[in-house]
């Protein structure tokens, strides 16, 4: 599900920024843009072998948006830009994965504390539900929580970590009356188990 919907549109925006930068600066890459995208991808557990699938959904979205303007020449040019950026991201993401205390992309975490703070916000604290080694986290990093949606599909939602004790992960979830995922997270109780992608540093707030 992370490869459909808003994900291709968000990535398309980053690729446009990347393309503009390399046109203006032919001998360098936009490190800040690449870092931001790489950390988001790593927080979702995206791996090198998934980039062709990302390409498929991305270019389907581009073709739908451009219509007849998506000529073979334009598609070829943007494909080249995609793989220039993609290969740079793959290198960065490999470094992020190598810095972790484990080699898994996600593991089970249980809710150990739940506090309602008003204004439809609940603060959830998680601890590992198994013995998977954890890298120490800090407030402000990315985290992705994976829960089953009402239709049975599993979906990931990114949040920014709050400060917490060692081996804990804490997030604040604001209820969106029109959003399915926030209502599911609001219904979690102490003892419930979810899957969590391993934490990566962030460089900007998660929207």
Language model regions located:
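Surface-exposed loop/turn and secondary-structure junction residues enriched for glycine/proline
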Residues: 6, 14, 47-49, 72, ...
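Acidic-glycine-rich active-site phosphate/pyrophosphate-binding loop
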Residues: 28-34, 189-197
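A short, basic/flexible loop-to-alpha-helix module at the beginning of a structural domain
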Residues: 199-207
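Globin-like tetrapyrrole-binding proteins
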Residues: 1-106
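Ferredoxin-reductase
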Residues: 103-193
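Short acidic/polar capping segments at secondary-structure boundaries
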Residues: 83, 116-117, 200-201
């Amino acid at each position: 599900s992370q490869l459909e919907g808003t994900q291709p549109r968000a990535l398309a925006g980053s690729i446009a920024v990347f393309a503009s930068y390399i046109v203006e600066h032919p001998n360098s890459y936009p490190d800040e843009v690449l870092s931001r995208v790489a950390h988001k991808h790593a927080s979702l557990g995206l791996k090198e072998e998934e980039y062709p699938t990302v390409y498929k959904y991305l270019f389907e979205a581009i073709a739908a948006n451009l219509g007849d303007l998506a000529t073979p020449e334009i598609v070829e040019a943007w494909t080249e830009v995609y793989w220039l950026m993609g290969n740079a991201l793959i290198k960065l993401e490999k470094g992020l994965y190598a810095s972790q205390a484990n080699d898994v992309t996600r593991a089970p975490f249980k809710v150990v504390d739940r506090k309602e703070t008003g204004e439809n916000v609940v603060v959830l604290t998680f601890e590992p539900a198994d013995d998977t080694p954890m890298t120490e986290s800090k407030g402000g990093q990315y985290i992705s929580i994976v829960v089953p949606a009402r239709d049975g599909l599993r979906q990931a939602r990114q949040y920014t970590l709050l400060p917490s004790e060692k081996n804990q992960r804490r997030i604040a979830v604001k209820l969106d009356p029109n959003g399915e995922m926030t209502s599911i997270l609001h219904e979690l109780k102490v003892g419930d188990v979810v899957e969590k992608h391993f934490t990566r540093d962030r460089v900007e707030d998660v929207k």
